[in-house]
Amino acid sequence: GMAADMTAQSWVDPERFPLLRRRMYSTLENPNLLGAYAVMIISILTAFFLRERQKKRKWAFAIILFVLLLCLALTYSRGAWLSLAAIVLGLTLFYDKRFGFLFFLIPLVLFFYHGQMVERFLSLFSGEDTSVGLRFALWESTIAMIEERPLLGVGWGSYYLAYPDYNFFIQDEHVLIFHAHNMYLNMLAEVGIIGGAAFLLTFFAQGFLCWKLYRGKASLFTRTLGLGGLLMVMAIAVISMSDHVLFGRSISFCFWSLSALCVGSGDW
């Protein structure tokens, strides 16, 4: 049953990370999806934490943020960790430049802490990580897919059907690859330049509209939603470079629902 399937999955490479036993994924079946969900909620909640004036609510937001950050750390999702940096960058650019000092903590943590989290993060640059190698191979195949059908693509949701014809790496017909582990390449491959441009325009338009809300003269609540929505779009834009998290229906539903909530709160 479902419990047995969840117990059997660990999402780790025991040869590359022998001390890493399990990655948290909750009911989302994949740690990267849980990481994407966490950064979306962190984005919105951070905005409300910063703008909240009532002490009790601020403490409540702080506790929930701490739990979410701990959860994000335990996913061991490097893409999600990098998207957290995008949230900090967004706060630096659009809220308070002093948040930029948080980036100076990264080398300090890497220097003094040598646990599994640091080892997993640094493996991005080692050239020996299997998941990184797989992604480069998938991107090479996806680029070939785009070059062959640049305008209209292979068809919406048909990546897994087209991939075997461009399989340069796995060479196993029983392994299904559902997406390119890169939202940008995946959209271009499935719906071509025309459809891909339309999708990406719609995606980044959410961030632009949220920015307009945040910089506008609406209520404090609406401007806070605007800031949170802007941070969320920046975070998903970054994590989508190494995974196609919006392929997951639960994550996609959450993202577009939160986008609708943020954008719809404005008096356009």
List PLM regions with ranges:
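Alpha-helical transmembrane segments of multi-pass inner-membrane proteins
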Residues: 1-22, 26-94, 98-109, 205-212, ...
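Membrane-interfacial loop-to-transmembrane alpha-helix junctions, especially the N-terminal start
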Residues: 60-61, 219-229
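Alpha-helical transmembrane segments
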Residues: 208-222
